[in-house]
Amino acid sequence: MKLLRKTVFAATLLLTAFGAHAQKKPAATAAAPAAANSLLWEVSGKGLSAPSYVFGTMHMICPADMQLSEPLKQAVRNSHQVVMELDMDDPSMAQQMQAGMLMQGGQTLQQLLSADDYARFGAYLQTKAGLPVDKVGAIKPFMLGSMLLPAVLGCQPASYETTFVQMAQEQKKEVLGLETVQDQLGLFDKIPYAEQSKMLADMVNKETEMKQEMQQLLGLYKAQRVEALHELSVKSLFGFTKYNDLLLDARNQRWIASMEKLAAAQPTFFAVGAAHLGGPKGVLALLRQQGYQVRPVAF
């Protein structure tokens, strides 16, 4: 049971908001160039009675690298609800996650990797995450990879998402999700398990490159360069480039309709993975295409 809770928690992190009263607004910059550097964006216009906000997260990040600035806190305070990729305060989330964690067809990691790669990954998983591979080998490989992110980051990671849930609860605000646990877990049934398993082997066999790429992503994130971060994410050595439409673009498109309805109802703070913000099919570009003014906020 303890092992299961640990696995579900890490996987959750991976999959890892217009009022009648006046609002104190974070200071938005005057212009909105597509390549402006910010993780926090104000969305206004198109009949909205008050702004909403979009923030780009890293689902797992070292506590020392988290930036909970006053403009970010103010954006949450200004909003009447907090909306993330998933409804993170749903009490049934762990149960839903558990129900969808396993590979279909009874497949296991041992069947998907060579004997050498399986042995190396098993030793690595035990050393870095304290997990016996024979106990978790039926879990979808992408989710198993989440168990190793603390080792790649070099810390016990924190989560913007859990922080925003806490802030929302303290401020008596509703937390909602743009998609369901089933939506997210279902994505990893559409990517061949063999390809996901290769990623696990690469995490061990190319550990240095993995850590270097993670530090590069983190550097771009801390510099708030959302366009460059998007470009690196879609070209990642350890990513799934040919599945960018499945993992990013198609999801962005689905989210926009929900985001429009939520923002029209009341000012909303949206928090999604930063890789979803940039690019011609990113959330920011799609909101502009729908006629909204999208401005970077000094963060």
PLM feature segments, named:
Residues 35, 64, 250-254:
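Short secondary-structure boundary/capping elements
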